[in-house]
Amino acid sequence: MTHKRFKFVHITPFNYQMKKIAALTMARNDSFFLEKWIDYYGKELGEENLYVFLDGNDQNLPANAGKSNITVRSHTQMSRSEGDKDRIALLSEFAATLFEQYDLVIGTDVDEFLAVDPKCNTSLSKYLSSLNIETSVSGLGVDVGQHSV
């Protein structure tokens, strides 16, 4: 576009090639947030790129599972710290295998959502694709509505 005094040039804020991105979580007795997690990351990344571990055969599949990859594993009663270590080991090992197919893997708790600053005017997948990530990148965490007032 040109103007008598100015030449307008369209500038793309990010120069990037879209990366293939997966999201990974584990849930137990948290269908409320799991359905929201699948909805949010499914729209951002595509349901087929979501990986969910349900902790226990007593867990129901989410109503909106769609094309998500869901694995149900037997629940083992453990102390909180043992359970956390077991969960992190499982998810880390699985994430490592996902890197055979994906450029990036997002790992979050089921009640955690990565969002791009609206001022960036871009989607999560486009924003992450624009970054030059060598090992890892992390976001700022904020609890919203953790406790009722």
Specify the residue positions occupied by each region the protein language model found:
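Conserved donor-nucleotide/metal-binding helix-loop-beta segment in metal-dependent transferases, i.e.
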Residues: 116-147
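Residues at the starts of beta-strands that form the adenosine-phosphate
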Residues: 20, 48-50
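Short, solvent-exposed loop/turn segments at secondary-structure junctions
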Residues: 57-58, 78, 111-113, 142-145
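Active-site beta-to-alpha loop of glycosyltransferases that engages the nucleotide-sugar donor
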Residues: 19, 25-36, 56
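Juxtamembrane luminal stem/stalk of type II transmembrane Golgi/ER carbohydrate-processing enzymes
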Residues: 3-17
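Short, acidic, metal-binding catalytic loop of nucleotide-sugar glycosyltransferases
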Residues: 39-48
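Active-site-proximal specificity loops/subdomain of glycosyltransferases
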Residues: 59-107, 116
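A structural signal for short, well-ordered beta-strand segments and their strand-loop junctions
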Residues: 52, 105-109, 115, 136-140
